[in-house]
Amino acid sequence: MIVGEPGPVDEVVVSLKELLQMEHCPRPWRRLDLYIVRDGSVVFYVGQSYTAFDRVWSHFYDGFKARSTLGRLIVCNWPASMHWTVELLSSGLERFAAVEHDLDAAEQLLIEELAPCLNEALNRQPSPLPKAYRPPTAPPTCPRSPNKLIREAAYAVKAEQRRT
């Protein structure tokens, strides 16, 4: 463990471009098992995984192979999608006490509460994808290389840091 590294956290909010600069899940984030991908008030997807960070990365890579609807949405809306927000949460948060911190039940609770556009399972009334976004079925207009998008995200992060 790195000296001075913080302990586990229950919630992290990061832009997709920032997440794409992290090759490995930071140790304090490893217990975060739920994730939300959104653009402001538009919630695209809610999911779960024993390591949510890794699952978001899987969606990103699988979008290039059309194996992930969320990943495809990211690719089809690049470069705007690099500014979307990724929320990583722990099912151990107090807000999930009513469902006894059960991971499946916590995910279902978030889906019912947020009605994400892309979740079809467990979602009685998914929000329609606003017309401002290209659907995941659209042909991508960005480079078909994940590494190129990761580099573009890195440039955007550096430009943002210079402005502040």
Task: Kindly give the residue locations of the regions a language model identified.
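Boundary/linker segments flanking structured domains
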Residues: 1-32, 38-44, 48-164
